[in-house]
From Swiss-Prot:
A motif (EWI motif) lies at residues 250-252. Residues 22-139, 144-262, 276-386, 406-527, 545-661, 678-800, 810-934, 951-1067 form the Ig-like C2-type domain. This is Immunoglobulin superfamily member 3. Disulfide bonds join C43-C121, C168-C246, C302-C376, C432-C511, C566-C645, C701-C779, C835-C918, C974-C1051. Residues 21-1095 are extracellular. GO terms for cellular component: membrane. It comes from Xenopus laevis. Keywords: Disulfide bond, Immunoglobulin domain, Membrane, Repeat, Signal, Transmembrane, Transmembrane helix. The gene is igsf3. The chain crosses the membrane at residues 1096-1116. Pfam families: V-set. It is found in: Membrane. Residues 1117-1165 are cytoplasmic.
Amino acid sequence: MGTAAGLLLAALLLAGTSWAQREVNIQQGPLYRAEGSQISIWCNVRGYQGPSEQNFLWSIYLPSAPEKEIQMVGTSDPSFSYAIYSQRVRSGDIYVERVSGDHALLHIRQLQEQDAGEYECHTPNTDPTYHGSYSAKMNLHVIPDTLTVSSPAQTLQKVEGGSLQVTCEVSQNSSQHTHLSVSWLRISGGEEHEIISLTQNLSVRAGPTYAQKHSVGDVRMDKLGDSTFRLTLYNLHPSDQGEIHCVGTEWIQDPDGTWFPLTQKRSEGTSVTVQPTDKEFNVRLETERRTYGAGDMASLRCIIDAQNPAERLFAVSWAFNSSLIASQSPGGVPSLTGEYAKREDRGEVRVGKDSDIVFSLKIFHLRPEDSGKYNCRVTERERGPSGELIDRESKRPKNIPISVLPLRTSLTVTVTANSSSVLEGVRLSLTCSVASLAGPQSRISASWHLQDKQGRQREVVRQDRDGVTWAGEQYRERLGTGELRLIRSGSDTFSLELEGSQRTDTGSYECRVAEWVPATDGEWQLLGERSAQANVDIMALETGFAVTAITRTPGVSYFDSFDLQCILKPHYPPWVGVSVTWRFQPAGGGDTHDLVTFSRAGGVQWGERAGSFRGRSVVEKGDSTHTVKLSVSRASDSEAGKYQCVAELWRWEYRGTWTQLAERASNLLEIRVQRPVPRLQVSKVTRTLSVVEGSQVTLSCSIRSQTGPDSRFAVLWFMRQPSGADGKLIVRSNTGMEYGTYAEEASLKGRLQLEVTAPGHYTLTLQGAHADDSGSYYCQVEEWAMDPNQAWYRLAEEASGMTEIRVRVPDANLQLDQIPRNVSALEGQSFTVTCHVLNRTLPDSRLSLEWLSWWAGHMERRALVRLTVDGVTILGSVEEENVAPGLPSRMQVSQPSLGLYALTLRGTEVQDTGTYSCLVQEWLQDPRGQWYKRTEERSGATYVSVRQPDPALQLDSSLLNVSLMEGGHFDLDCVVSSRSRPDSQLAISWSLQGASRGAEQETLLNVDRSGVWAPMAPRWEGRLQQLQLSPTLFRLHVPRVGQGDSGNYTCLVQEWLQGPRGNWYLLAQDESLIGWIRVQSKESNLQSTICANDALFYLVFFYPFPIFGILIITILLVRFRHRPTSKPGEGKNGVPLLWIKEPHLNYSPTCLEPPVLSIHPGTID
């Protein structure tokens, strides 16, 4: 038990570490809130599974019924709320705000007294299993609102510089520990400003706009008594006027330590007006004009309109585009920032105070970047109680925009090129002309830029205003070697020269010229820039480079001559090198190889595979140096093929090296060298020969004409079978005799004979024709001649007409019985199927026979047994799946008579059911003594049905109705009235359907066909006994019965039969209801038994009374009649009297027999 508990605890710990646990959290309580205020309670869930958006259900448990849940509001079902809250939910007084998928807030806008209670937040389960917490609770207390805030409404008129006092009554009467905070507010122009506050922590805090005044003591707050608070303002200013309110707030500390405002109230306002003294002032900003040129001077004046300016303190700040550039103290001391401080040092900018009311900003040398908006801000300052300056009021006028126009140049630039299209390698020259300079003091700088065809731009070369020249990164090497030059002619011309122009020099050339003038600070100022462009295209040397090959004699005969010409275009200057190579590809195929090459220096070099071309070819170069001719004599097949001219273009570099620019290949010239026209003719006569196997066949081949008297001939004999597309070589005759592959395959070597009966007449004789020799035969003649290279070549070939040979075999005449039959057999018996050969092709032919079957449930055919032509019996492949083992031993093949074959199968099984037939093959002997299959035929099908015995199991259906007392016993009989076969075996199963309603059927006892009992339920263990009184009678004895044994008892019998292979299978089963058994308790056994049975009732309560009465009367009469003469205690003749000692009732345990009343002898006292 301890081990099991440990394993269970370990499993729970493992599950806890591997499964996520849902956890619901709610805001910590208890919380105290005032009646009429609003509240928000948060709730979240974590560790859940399922969708990311969880639902939240809020309920309340009222103090009056702490166990009763009242549904308030939820996120999933609008009808979740109970009637007491549904109206407030619909009106929006109570609602749930979803912060995220697993976080929500419950809002109650106006708390009521009945809202106090225990709040529960519940999240419905979305996990596969229940694991963790699904709800959390907190308490809310709603307390009365006892806060009071009051201040008399009044209107006060004050003068600037005066003082002000206002009082306010703030009190509370709460049963909880709360704190009060008091704030004074001023409302002016719709805006609310905090003056001063006493926080719940009893600290004083001034508002942002009154922090300065509070620091100097002009604002203070005093507490008079328990609930009176007084505000005092000194040194009033017009900005202090407005409506002043007192705000009281009651605070309570929540369990998490934070302070929460229970309630807040505001008093009526006190209207305050502060009459200002005459201290107003205005500001103006002036300038002479708003548009200037670069280098001009601009002056801006900031003018103050005020009373007694000499006695007042004004500070001025200057701004450009809203950025501070300078400031002046009331004493006129300037302070400039950033770049303007540097310009002040150089004397370009000055800030001054012209008078008490005029402040100026002067810029002596304007720049274009000085364009923008200028402004000044005037701030009046006053001295505080401690002597420090305090900003009183600040004003600024409207912005003044100033535009500074830059100086413009009047340059004009033009670019010209020596040519818009330049051949690669030729010098490129461009000229940039400049006109209309600003004056003698101005200087110019120039730069050349190139934009290629891809739109990429790069700098070529540059010369600054001092005449210093440098090249771009990609042109520095060419500048150093002198290929790149920038030449300035006078003061207005810049020439760009590029020696050995390259393809990359193609593009748009831009000349950029900048004009500079001296600035006031000694530097040079850019006055303007102009540019012009010119497009230059550098034509590659290979542009238009082409090679063409021509010939006048594309076709020649043996021993003729032919010429080939290679033409180059265009004409190039001498410094351009050209090399030419003739290439050749033989007509018979193979790789193209070089024949001869003219180098750019004029040398001639033959290729390694030139071969015979050297002895019969002449190479010439034309006077124009652009034509190369190749002449070939004594043409043969070796010179037939495709010729091609390949030219290479080279350029001499300034470094002293050659660079290959291009390679061009000409068109292909095919030279055909023709052989003599053949005049070979072979006889085309066609014949058809039909012979019988073993006969001799003679074929002939005749040449009618030939090309020349010196021709030689080779004769090839072919055979083409009807199913073949191409002929197969049999034999070849030339100077000797060569057998083809077909002669080997068809064993023709020993049966062939070749003869030349006359010049041009050839014969082929075939001895002992076979059936396989059938087909079409023909000869093919090859004519051979000698070429110019003294080599024999095949000049022509021609085939003769077809001779069709048909070698006959006897016609097939095999016939079998095709009548279908049906055979039926019981399992374990045998059946026989027959195969009858009605006719055959030849009497001496041989037969082979194969028995086939198609068993039920199997689509494929199976071969059972085969009888060869030699009479050998061979078993078929019957080891397939689901085939009964031992099948070969059960089969027997016999031949009862000539042409009749039989297959007998013993010990049949149901699996043997199927279709049976025989397949017969007829074999004949050919001339070579070999047996070959002539034909085959399949007999008609015989359907065999193997069936099991018909089931005949039946049980007796007599029913019993028995009542008996608790503790008794009863017997049940299961009678088999009929069975299928005497040798079958029976299995018995007893079951009980209990008397209680809904009880399931219970198996009491299972006894298999061998008499082995199956394990029983614990309550039946040792109580049941089964007896087999006969082969068909089974009795179940049940002792010590109880009330739980009441119900319907059923007997189930299974009949098992042994199959041919010794295996037992279930043939039939039958179930019978035996009867109803009622078991009664002992407490009410006599009364209930008698009352439940009519026979017992009359036997006990009716029949005994008259019987007892008659017996008593008879005994008394006899006793009194014989008393004087008899002995005491004796009857007549000394026999003792009978006395009724006690009547006995014997009850049958099964209550099937009426009780028996018996009288026992006794003594009379």
